[in-house]
């Protein structure tokens, strides 16, 4: 089940960080829409980060958890999973057009996009380009979304492309308020992300 778990989580890697802010979103909740727009603009400027944390995956026939390392440098990413989730280790690296997945004791898999890996290995169609936005507490800009703001004008929850995303807590790092605990609910798949260390960076335009 290691490969299944790894590929499920590989959808976080598709780069969309440089896209615009023209998301088609319906905003509700306690927060102020003007403050939300400012918050969104600030977070969208982040084009680099390093994350250390934990990830849990629950599907109808299997589940697991493990540690997560995610390095983002504009259009390059290096994502590593290890621990009980995979009974070993895996590394996902790439940039737009070329993705490589290395699984301990199982081999190397390549595809143009993480979506292709999911489709080829599992037959699943998921909005894999969205998590690079969701992990920053933003809706993806290329499809409709329903956004609920908390009292601090940050995302409390998000509905987009059949997924429900809950933001349970935030942490302040280098002047940015970033998600600390996130739950994602999709059809027959739940993902929990706990970020223990955020190192956001603005590398340049």
Curated annotation (Swiss-Prot):
UniProt keyword Electron transport present: no
Superkingdom in the source lineage: Bacteria
Presence of the UniProt keyword Hydrolase in the record: no
UniProt main location, coarse: membrane
Subcellular localization(s) per the UniProt record: Cell outer membrane
One of the GO biological process terms: protein transport
Lipid group attachment sites (N-palmitoyl cysteine): 18
Signal peptide: 1-17
PROSITE patterns in the record: PROKAR_LIPOPROTEIN
Membrane topology, record value: Lipid-anchor
The protein's role, per its UniProt record: Plays a critical role in the incorporation of lipoproteins in the outer membrane after they are released by the LolA protein.
Xref: HAMAP family: LolB
The name this protein goes by in its record: Outer-membrane lipoprotein LolB
